[in-house]
């Protein structure tokens, strides 16, 4: 069993579960006698050869810590050819045998491109949006849902106290998994997701029915990527675009709150959960899945695999070609959304 020098990085938005994955990688690598090197702040770490050692002592107590001890960024080395070449050079200078990238579609997509250039790469999926194809689960989703549920519970208390409608804006650029699951588990009175064009008149009638039967408040959950019909508002600040071309979203909750108040005459406030959904100690599931995904990634490295990520399929962890998720989004089935509308308050 040959010893290896394995690099690890975390890219894109942070989320709970990254540190457990790092711990899982290091713990499994120790079984092989490997040396693990952390690349700081995502692909920027490879570009700048900015590293840190990942020893047992460094990771033994990080299971319950949110975020990532390696730091993260949205650096895209493929924006410039010279950056690509610098990364390839640094990979060799650091004497890496393989690199494990923990991230979403963008981070894993970069890993896939480097794999095609001959650098051994394995991916671990993470995103609180749970919108990656080919996998049933992504790190961070479970904890983020818990945060959304807790927020809805707290906001319902204040909505009830002041006889208001509160609109909760939840992350989800193209997919509404977080808003739908968080809204259902939190008992939101109505939920809007990007996959289904919103019917505002249906929403207004729903709130009218609640008030007609004596209820004095409502909580509406909406994913940040929802496009309200008839509005041409900018769903993100002008010029606020990341290295992968994504506009930073935010604001649909405020627009919806204004429309509810204007059309129903009920005081309405908007709350944007934003980065609260990314922080905090990982849930039990995110801790266990992080450990298992990290372990499997190291095993794939020792099997000589590259260009793959560890997918969750039922109760199994299986290697999947990263190219199968590039440019794709795992969306909520509109039929499923319609079926669970029965749980919206009546």
UniProtKB/Swiss-Prot annotation:
Signal peptide: none
Function as written in the Swiss-Prot or TrEMBL entry: Catalyzes the phosphorylation of D-fructose 6-phosphate, the first committing step of glycolysis. Uses inorganic phosphate (PPi) as phosphoryl donor instead of ATP like common ATP-dependent phosphofructokinases (ATP-PFKs), which renders the reaction reversible, and can thus function both in glycolysis and gluconeogenesis. Consistently, PPi-PFK can replace the enzymes of both the forward (ATP-PFK) and reverse (fructose-bisphosphatase (FBPase)) reactions.
Activity regulation note: Non-allosteric.
Binding positions for diphosphate per the UniProt entry: 13
Originating organism: Dictyoglomus thermophilum
Record's keyword annotation contains Ubl conjugation: no
Keywords: Cytoplasm, Glycolysis, Kinase, Magnesium, Metal-binding, Transferase
One GO location term (cellular component): 6-phosphofructokinase complex
EC annotation from Swiss-Prot or TrEMBL: 2.7.1.90
Family: Belongs to the phosphofructokinase type A (PFKA) family. Mixed-substrate PFK group III subfamily.
GO BP annotations listed: canonical glycolysis; fructose 1,6-bisphosphate metabolic process; fructose 6-phosphate metabolic process
Binding-site list for Mg(2+): 105
Site feature: Important for catalytic activity: 126
Cellular compartment(s): Cytoplasm
pH dependence, record text: Optimum pH is 5.7-6.3 for the forward reaction and 7.0-7.5 for the reverse reaction.
The organism's place on the tree of life at top rank: Bacteria
Required cofactor names: Mg(2+)
Annotated substrate binding sites: 127-129, 164, 171-173, 224, 269, 275-278
GO molecular function, one term: fructose-6-phosphate binding
Protein name (record): Pyrophosphate--fructose 6-phosphate 1-phosphotransferase
Pathway it works in: Carbohydrate degradation; glycolysis; D-glyceraldehyde 3-phosphate and glycerone phosphate from D-glucose: step 3/4
Active site per UniProt: 129
Subunit and interaction comment: Homodimer.
């Amino acid at each position: 069993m040959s010893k290896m020098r394995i690099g690890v990085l975390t890219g894109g938005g942070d989320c709970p579960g990254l540190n457990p994955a790092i711990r899982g990688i290091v713990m499994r690598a120790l079984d092989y006698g490997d040396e693990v090197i952390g690349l700081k702040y995502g692909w920027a770490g490879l570009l700048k050869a900015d590293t840190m050692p990942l020893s047992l002592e460094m990771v033994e107590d990080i299971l319950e810590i949110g975020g990532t001890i390696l730091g993260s960024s949205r650096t895209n080395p493929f924006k410039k050819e010279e950056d690509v070449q610098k990364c390839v050079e640094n990979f060799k200078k650091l004497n890496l045998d393989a690199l494990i990238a923990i991230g979403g579609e963008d981070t894993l997509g970069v890993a896939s491109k480097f794999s095609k250039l001959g650098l051994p790469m394995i991916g671990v999926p993470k995103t609180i949006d749970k919108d990656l194809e080919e996998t049933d689960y992504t790190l961070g989703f479970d904890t983020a849902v818990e945060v959304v549920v807790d927020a809805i519970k707290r906001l319902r208390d204040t909505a009830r106290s002041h006889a208001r409608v509160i609109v909760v804006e939840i992350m989800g650029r193209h997919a509404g998994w977080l808003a739908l699951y968080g809204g259902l588990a939190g008992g939101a009175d109505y939920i809007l997701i990007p996959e289904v064009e919103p019917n505002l008149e249906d929403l207004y009638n729903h709130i009218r029915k609640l008030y007609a039967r004596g209820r004095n408040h409502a909580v509406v959950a909406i994913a940040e990527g929802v496009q309200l019909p008839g509005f041409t508002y900018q769903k993100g600040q002008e010029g606020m675009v990341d290295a992968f071309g994504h506009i930073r979203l935010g604001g649909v909750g405020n627009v919806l709150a204004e429309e509810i108040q204007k059309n129903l005459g009920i005081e309405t406030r908007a709350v944007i959960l934003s980065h609260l959904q990314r922080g905090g100690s990982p849930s039990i599931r995110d801790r266990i899945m992080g450990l298992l995904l990290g372990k499997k990634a190291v095993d794939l490295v020792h099997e000589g695999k590259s260009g793959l990520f560890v997918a969750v399929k039922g109760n199994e962890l299986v290697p999947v070609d990263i190219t199968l998720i590039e440019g794709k989004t795992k969306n909520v089935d509109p039929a499923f959304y319609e079926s669970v509308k029965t749980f919206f308050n009546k």
